[in-house]
């Protein structure tokens, strides 16, 4: 089963689930292959766990690059820090996308009744909600769902048209709150991540808050991998690291 999967080497869907790399067509399914692969334990301490995924024949058949992907968790009191590091171990430039997909337990009845909401730490007047067409990013923006430039109301119909994907967030701090209990459930800080995805499966006892470096293909995508918007490109030997944190409240 998937538990807090890492999205790599893509986030979201590719047009026709295919992409072109160096003139050859490859198939990569939604959110990439890393989320379905077993990572090797590297370090296990009481408050620090680190895991590693290395390229192999399976990944090379879908993504012809040499890499190491580290997934690390560090606990500090009631805060959990997620750290992702990608290293280009090959001899050519390596483009990729990266994202987190952690899920957090909620009461599905409270979601159904509209008791949950998300609140940014400050007013956000430059945000845009991406509009998805069969999982691909459309040419127009979706309706802005922010109330008073700060609050996103949540209920059982919030995700009828797939995930909410927000870009242009200035203050990268958001809290999940419950109006019935008048409590803050958690606060996420995601500085350095251009996008935030929000999603829940109908009737599920969880909600996903997903910091992303990139998004799905556009509906008019050329399918050429290096032409995807927001790709991170590492030169041989270079590495990229990004982190976010979640603070939990009783």
Model-inferred region functions:
Residues 1-4, 210-222:
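Short, basic/aromatic beta-hairpin or loop at an interaction surface
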Residues 103-106, 110-190:
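Active-site/ligand-binding surface loops and adjacent short beta/alpha elements
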Residues 19-27, 84, 232-248:
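Short Pro-Gly-centered flexible turn/kink motifs
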Residues 1-21:
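Acidic-aromatic substrate-binding/catalytic surfaces of carbohydrate-active enzymes
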Residues 22-77:
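Extended, loop-rich substrate-binding clefts of extracytoplasmic carbohydrate-active enzymes
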């Amino acid at each position: 089963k998937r538990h807090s999967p890492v999205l790599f080497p893509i986030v979201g869907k590719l047009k026709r689930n295919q992409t072109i790399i160096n003139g050859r067509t490859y198939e990569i399914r939604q959110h990439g292959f890393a989320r379905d692969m077993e990572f090797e334990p590297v370090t296990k301490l009481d408050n620090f766990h680190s895991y590693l995924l290395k390229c192999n024949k399976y990944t090379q058949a879908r993504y012809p690059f040499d890499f190491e992907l580290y997934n690390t968790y560090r606990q500090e009191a009631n805060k959990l820090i997620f750290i992702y590091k990608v290293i280009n171990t090959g001899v050519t430039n390596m483009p990729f996308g990266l994202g987190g997909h952690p899920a957090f337990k909620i009461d599905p009845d409270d979601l159904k009744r509209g008791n949950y909401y998300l609140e940014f730490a400050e007013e956000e007047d430059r945000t845009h909600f991406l509009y998805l067409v069969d999982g691909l990013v459309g040419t127009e923006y979706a309706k802005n769902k922010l109330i008073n430039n700060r609050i996103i109301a949540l209920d059982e119909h919030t995700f009828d048209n797939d995930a909410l994907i927000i870009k242009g967030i200035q203050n990268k701090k958001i809290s999940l709150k419950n109006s019935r209990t008048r409590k803050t459930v958690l606060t996420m800080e995601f500085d350095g991540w251009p996008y935030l995805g929000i999603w829940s499966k109908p009737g599920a006892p969880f909600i996903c808050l997903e910091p992303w470096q990139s998004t799905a293909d556009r509906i008019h995508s050329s399918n050429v991998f290096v032409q995807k918007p927001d790709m991170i490109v590492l030169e041989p030997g270079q590495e990229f690291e990004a982190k976010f944190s979640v603070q939990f409240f009783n």
